[in-house]
């Protein structure tokens, strides 16, 4: 989950969006929760097994 925290930091300091690496569904759910707690927006993109989370600012 360290990569999620790094991506959250990048988005909160100015990067428009960040794509995380593809992960299984249970990991993506945890990523979405961390992103929501940081008051950012996230969406999943792609098809399994390459589905990934993208983080945006509000």
Identify what each model region corresponds to.
Residues 1-58:
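Intrinsic disorder
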């Amino acid at each position: 989950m360290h990569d999620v925290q790094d991506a959250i930091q990048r988005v909160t300091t100015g990067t428009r969006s960040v794509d995380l690496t593809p992960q299984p569904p249970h990991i993506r759910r945890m990523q979405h929760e961390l992103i929501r707690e940081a008051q950012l927006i996230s969406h999943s993109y792609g098809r399994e097994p390459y589905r990934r989370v993208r983080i945006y600012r509000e």
